[in-house]
């Protein structure tokens, strides 16, 4: 194990808590930050603190926002009769990259995963059900194409069928076991166009 002063070791530990960041990458990030000019470090720290203090969840869809409702939910040009259900806020960014979807979103903030101890009550399904009214014609389920995403999609289909709304699933142009975050625009567009009713 490397020997660093306590302050450096603490920064390495904090960077290593980020998803996809191991100890080696955390060390590189730490050393990079320490070599930045002091004013850049201050700006970086201010940006982190400001984002953490001002960003919240949209009360309608659950997306990250600095105003409530978010820009998508408050946009009068969005088709509110179509709701695309996704697992995490980052998936909205992926879907928006294709520039073809004009509906609104619903963020579950997770998926159903019995192995991880997450059931339907642990994700934002009650909020989704509350959004289904006479104005919603279709719910597109765009959960990730893995075991948990499929289980979540089937559960959503089952509960929404009773409400008389059309439920579709994006096509599997996205590799099984993959994440929306890593899909390119063409793959996402094909998956959206090839969605099927579930």
Curated annotation (Swiss-Prot):
Zinc finger (C4-type) in chain: 58-73
Keyword Metal-binding recorded: yes
Gene3D superfamilies (UniProt xref): 3.30.60.80, 3.40.1360.10, 6.10.250.240, RecR Domain 1
Disulfide bond positions: none
Toprim domain: residues covered: 81-175
Alphabetical UniProt keywords: DNA damage, DNA recombination, DNA repair, Metal-binding, Zinc, Zinc-finger
Tagged with keyword DNA repair: yes
Transmembrane segments: none
CDD domains tied to this protein: TOPRIM_recR
PROSITE patterns: RECR, TOPRIM
A Pfam family per the record: RecR_HhH
A biological process term (GO) from this entry: DNA recombination
GO molecular function ontology, one term from the record: zinc ion binding
Function statement: May play a role in DNA repair. It seems to be involved in an RecBC-independent recombinational process of DNA repair. It may act with RecF and RecO.
Protein name per its UniProtKB record: Recombination protein RecR
Organism per entry: Clostridium kluyveri (strain ATCC 8527 / DSM 555 / NBRC 12016 / NCIMB 10680 / K1)
